[in-house]
């Protein structure tokens, strides 16, 4: 009787075990381990934790309440973490969990016109950011063989810079000067001048006042610049960890467009605040201090950031990333630690002096201390022909003017040189938010360097150049188009411009002006 019962149960058991095997195949059960540590101390934007034995350098970690941080110090007994959010709700004893990944940010067309923080979270109350993909904030700079020479100009729309300190696409040009000398104004005017130039702009605000950033964003929006601009913000009250990663995150967002073959301009405002945030983190985490209490790798953190700005070879799309880092000096001390580091890293600097600013000369560019090491090769041929010797002659004029203050009797030729130099200085002045097209710049610079402004009273020079700009757009559009498209100024066009300006604008300065 027992054997028939077993025969009946056998197919039932086989069916049950087969069902078990099928479920196991469809729903694999795997144990997932999580490494969780305990926060032992917390404050001033950093935390220390134990129990994270396998955590890696700069790995993203998660605190309660979806607060995020980065592993910064890997000591034998504990891990030093930097907070990317405010830590008001955190306390010693709370858990911290590994994520197994590095910090990444959204990139793509969906960021254009948006204001975000260093983690990609929106700050403009316009909903979530739509992104093509996410990329890590720390990326390797392009290799040497992947780079191309800087040959295409980036027009700032500012005469003093485009004529004397030209910038090329893919260059790194430092803007340096004391506070309230117009550093941000130059960067903003450069962004405004990229309208209709197929250049994507990224403005990175580090440690700036919220009111100042809000005013700048409003200005960009009112002038239609936000359509091609991304603003990445870490205000002064943000955690030092967030301020530290902000320029790297902004560069990752900019690199996406560069790798798509587009030209990109990025402004870092400013890197002295970035250096101070890194110094604060390093001192709190007990890293050895060096000169001015900055850690020993402060040069490296800026070098690895700015080396990501370049011009790619045509085989890689031919895109470019132009960097305009800003750094603030104290009491015109250009030889301070961070400014000298950045001067040695970048391809030139635009130095703004408070002496010129206080005299009402805007932009307050000190031509003698400013230089562009690679931009000269990218300057438009038309501009190079017009302003080729202008830098040298203008520097000589400034020295001559200083000498003339002693009351020495001057020869007639010297007096004429002084008068022309003063008119050149007047022409180079330019109010904020009024970038000029390159054709208008060249016409005005041609007129002043050829002496056509010599008989115009200095107080009327500004009005004269405004008349020239308006008139050539209206009367000589063909020459403007040739300059804009080809960058060339033929001898015929040159003579036509000079004769037309002399006969129609400056013929009778008393009546015209």
From Swiss-Prot:
Membrane topology reported for the UniProt record: Peripheral membrane protein
GO cellular component: plasma membrane-derived thylakoid membrane; proton-transporting ATP synthase complex
Catalytic activity, as annotated: ATP + H2O + 4 H(+)(in) = ADP + phosphate + 5 H(+)(out)
InterPro entries: Alt_ATP_synth_F1_asu (IPR017710), ATP_synth_asu-like_sf (IPR023366), ATP_synth_asu_C (IPR000793), ATP_synth_asu_C_sf (IPR038376), ATP_synth_F1_a_nt-bd_dom (IPR033732), ATP_synth_F1_asu (IPR005294), ATPase_a/bsu_AS (IPR020003), ATPase_F1/V1/A1_a/bsu_N (IPR004100)
Binding site for ATP: 177-184
Keyword annotations: ATP synthesis, ATP-binding, CF(1), Hydrogen ion transport, Ion transport, Membrane, Nucleotide-binding, Plasmid, Thylakoid, Translocase, Transport
Annotated compartments: Cellular thylakoid membrane
Function comment: Produces ATP from ADP in the presence of a proton gradient across the membrane. The alpha chain is a regulatory subunit.
NCBIfam families named in the record: alt_F1F0_F1_al, atpA, PRK13343.1
Family (UniProt): Belongs to the ATPase alpha/beta chains family.
Name the record gives this protein: ATP synthase subunit alpha 2
Species name: Acaryochloris marina (strain MBIC 11017)
């Amino acid at each position: 009787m027992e054997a028939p019962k077993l025969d009946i149960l056998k197919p039932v058991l086989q069916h049950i075990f087969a069902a078990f095997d099928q479920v196991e195949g469809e729903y694999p059960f795997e144990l997932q381990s999580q490494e969780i540590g305990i926060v032992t101390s917390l404050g001033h934007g950093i935390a220390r934790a134990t129990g994270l034995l396998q955590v890696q350098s700069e790995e993203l970690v998660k605190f309660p309440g979806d607060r995020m941080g980065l592993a910064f110090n890997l000591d034998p007994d504990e891990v030093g973490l930097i907070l990317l959010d405010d830590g008001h709700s955190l306390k010693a004893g709370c858990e911290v969990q590994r994520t197994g990944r590095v910090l990444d940010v959204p990139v793509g067309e969906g960021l254009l016109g948006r204001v975000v923080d260093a983690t990609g979270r929106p700050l403009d109350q316009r909903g979530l950011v739509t992104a093509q993909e996410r990329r890590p904030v720390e990326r390797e700079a392009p290799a040497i063989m992947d780079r191309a020479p800087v040959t295409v100009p980036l027009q700032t729309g500012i005469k003093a810079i485009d004529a004397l300190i030209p910038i090329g696409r893919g260059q790194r040009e430092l803007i340096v000067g004391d506070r309230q000398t117009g550093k941000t104004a130059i960067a903003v005017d450069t962004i405004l001048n990229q309208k209709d130039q197929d250049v994507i702009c990224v403005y990175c605000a580090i440690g700036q006042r919220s009111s100042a950033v809000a005013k700048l964003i409003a200005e960009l929006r009112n002038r239609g610049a936000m359509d091609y601009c991304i603003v990445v913000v870490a205000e002064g009250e943000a955690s030092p960890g967030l301020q530290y990663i902000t320029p790297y995150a902004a560069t990752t967002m900019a690199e996406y467009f560069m790798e798509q073959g587009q030209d990109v301009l990025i402004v870092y405002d400013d890197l002295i605040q970035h250096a101070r945030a890194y110094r604060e983190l390093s001192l709190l985490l007990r890293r050895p201090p060096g000169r001015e209490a900055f850690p020993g790798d402060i040069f490296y953190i800026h070098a690895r950031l700015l080396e990501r700005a370049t011009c790619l070879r045509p085989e890689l799309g031919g895109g470019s990333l132009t960097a305009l880092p800003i750094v603030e000096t104290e009491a015109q001390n250009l030889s301070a630690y961070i400014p000298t580091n950045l001067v040695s890293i970048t391809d030139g600097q635009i130095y703004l002096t408070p002496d010129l600013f206080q005299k009402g000369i805007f932009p307050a560019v000190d031509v003698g201390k400013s230089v562009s090491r690679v931009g000269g090769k990218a300057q438009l041929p038309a501009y190079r022909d017009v302003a080729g010797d202008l830098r040298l002659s203008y520097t000589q004029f400034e020295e001559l003017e200083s000498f003339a203050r002693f009351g020495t009797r001057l020869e007639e030729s010297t007096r004429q040189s002084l008068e022309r130099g003063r008119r050149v200085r007047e022409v180079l002045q330019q109010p904020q938010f009024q970038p000029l097209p390159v054709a208008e710049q060249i016409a005005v610079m041609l007129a002043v360097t050829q002496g056509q402004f010599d008989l115009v009273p200095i107080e009327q020079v500004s009005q004269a150049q405004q008349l020239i700009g308006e008139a050539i757009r209206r009367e000589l559009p063909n020459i403007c188009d040739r300059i804009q498209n080809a960058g060339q100024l033929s001898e015929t066009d040159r003579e036509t411009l000079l004769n037309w300006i002399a006969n129609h604008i400056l013929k009778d300065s008393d009546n015209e002006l």
